Amino acid sequence: MNIETIKSVYFIGAGGIGMSALIRYFLSKGKKVAGYDRTSSELTERLITEGAQIHYEEDIDLIPEECKDKASTLVVYTPAVPQGHAELTYFRENGFNIHKRSQVLGIITRSSKGLCVAGTHGKTTTSTMAAHLLHQSHVGCTAFLGGISKNYGTNLLLSATSPYTVIEADEFDRSFHWLSPWMSVITATDPDHLDIYGTKEAYLESFRHYTTLIQPGGALILHKGLEMQPDVQPGVTTYTYSRNEGDFHAENIRIGNGEIFIDFVAPDTRINDIQLGVPVSINIENGVAAIALAHLSGATDEEIKQGMASFRGVDRRFDFKLKNDRIVFLSDYAHHPAEIAQSVKSVRELYQDKKITVIFQPHLYTRTRDFYRDFADSLSLSDEVILTEIYPAREQPIPGVTSQLIYDNLRPGIEKCICRKEDVLSLLAQKHTEVLVVLGAGDLDNYAPQITQLLSEKYHG
């Protein structure tokens, strides 16, 4: 596939965060860009204002004529789209050039040095942090991110001169096997997506295979203590990292007054007094990995210090919506038990003497079925849990799998309830809340503006 000869690109599942970065990339190249998504969102509306043509009905008559020329049209779809989708079927039956999002990402980044961040969790913040460090340094970078950077208001950064491309490497559907990393961080390998992989062993094997794709001359930066065994090619250097130990780690950690400072330690340097722009404890570990990537790519110590201090975070990743003396409200994308535990622990560290209320919308029936006890354990670290119905995404319901499974396994004595997401606002209006955390990867975050308004009126500080 020659990207240069393509005139039109059609996206099925245009509203996905990873898809939208590709949409912005092809718009920047002057291509005609159109597509379908199931529902309108703030992101799809933004893409329309940027030049994309997007519709929300599954209807081949709504596909623009420019996208019906199979010789000059590339069709991109996400694995979340059902195989029987009418538009996908039309393109298949008519012999169009059809690729998964991950395949296209692999093709367009193959000519650059890919700086990839893989792992069950932490990859969006770590990759966005690394992209910011490089973008504001003399090194520069292009970046395809899995979240909206608060520094830039987008999930795509472009550089005409830098050899580096920062990529969030997604293990879902083995998507990251299409990449050719120059360097890669692996943050975590807690089993997930067992609907795809079946077993923990298959999940870990997928990460092992991914490490074989790192190019000779490059590097693997592996979180210390992971179960997986890397299998890198000759000429690839393997480093370890974590918060407190490894080739890259933090020392002299200072947390207080809403600020975090660390010293970064590497085999060949030490950078003292780095301030975290988003001062939550999980970002110490994320920061160590991001700094390691930037350091190995040539960013100077001073550029790294300035970049870490000016990093503003990622939408829906420990995203403070409201903060005053009477109420704190934040949203976090955490949707795996290990992520939720880290998120709640980080909140607890910041607000030790306050009641922490978590609203959690489980994401996927299969994930809920596979991990409901682990979800209950992680959520039980809070003081109160409000569960909504499961967000299905690409899945059909599974008999007997509901939020009740998590509810029934929460620790004894915890305040808890289940409600429809439509009733969350009225429930919060009646409750006394001190610190509210909305967790999950579904659509509950769409209510964040209304929740913010309700709480700011109720607890005007």
Protein language model features and the residues they cover:
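N-terminal leader/targeting and accessory segments in enzymes
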Residues: M1-K100, V104, A219, H249, ...
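Hydrophobic Val/Ile/Leu positions in short beta-strands of Rossmann-like dinucleotide-binding domains
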Residues: F11, Y77, V117-G119, V438
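Short internal beta-strands
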Residues: K31-R38, L220-K224, T357-F360, S382-P392
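Beta-strand->loop->alpha-helix junctions that form or flank phosphate-binding loops
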Residues: Y36-D37, H55-I60, H99-Q103, F144-G146, ...
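C-terminal helical cap/extension that packs against the catalytic core
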Residues: E50, A376-E434
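Short acidic/histidine-rich motifs immediately flanking catalytic phosphotransfer sites
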Residues: K68-L74, P163, H432-E434
